[in-house]
Amino acid sequence: ETQADLPGSARHDRVVKVVNTKVQLDPFYAKFVTNKGSGVGEGYWEETIAPGVSTGLDPSTMPHELVNTGTNAFTFKPITYINRLVGDDETNSHPSFVGKKINGAFFHSNRLGFLSDDNVIMSQAGDFFNFYHTTATTITASDPIDLSCSSTRPLQLHAAVPAPNGLVLISQNQQFLIFSESGSLTPRDSRITGLSNFEMDSKIPPVEVGTSFYFVSKTPAFSRVFSYTLTGVNTPPNVVDIAKVVTEYIPSSITDLQSSPQNSFIVLYSETDNTIYYYRFYKAT
């Protein structure tokens, strides 16, 4: 059946499961809404959620927001996430971060994204707090994206950096690129490919400068700093050890990395030391 085969008169709020036999569509649930809003009568059917399934996310366990409410005044509060309104656990499943730790958050391509284990999860396009599909019958270009990185080793994604070709996904020992041949990340077109196997400190987020980003890699005795430039989807990235000329000069106690893209420099420092390590570069004209 299809929704068009359902009766035009029924009890208000009656829910049925529609299994399509004429077209290639997933089963879905429909709720009847009478014209008068109660009782039995004529009305229309609208797609709804399956009876008895969870309606969505628990805001108390999700990332919160810090809102500027005035001069030097901020409010830290839960976010109101959009509930699951249609489908069930098969046709409109929970995002893969449910029941797991979220290790990072970012905005990209008009979507809010989270990193959890080896998964990258991105919200509805233009609807940052909606991680569910709008319909269970088909996939739309604006629907959420939920993909995992294929690797032979366990990994935890902890950072994401925008790139001309897509988004670089970073774990402690591997880097990946999520991209789309069409140029726009969508549930159908998005792909993840491996880029490199550099060790990156998971507690110091990389910073962007122009078309490159910089990251810290530590040994027990000192820290190394690298620049990372993506050269294409199918070509190795250009990675340079910019601290090689001062090997073992930067201590392993470094806790933060910051950048000034406009002034073409990065700085490193430690919360336990008053020394700043400064690196500036000049672009050839």
For the regions a language model picked out, list residue spans one by one.
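Beta-propeller domains
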Residues: 72-87, 115-141, 178-183
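Beta-strand-rich domains and repeat architectures in extracellular enzymes and scaffolds
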Residues: 93-118, 154-161
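A short helix->beta-strand "capping" segment at the edge of beta-propeller domains
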Residues: 77-100, 137-153, 249
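Long, charge-dense tracts
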Residues: 1-96
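Beta-sheet-dominated scaffold domains
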Residues: 119, 126, 148-285
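Context-gated lysine
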Residues: 17, 22, 31, 36, ...
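Eukaryotic alpha-helical scaffold "rod" segments
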Residues: 46, 53-68, 111-135, 216, ...
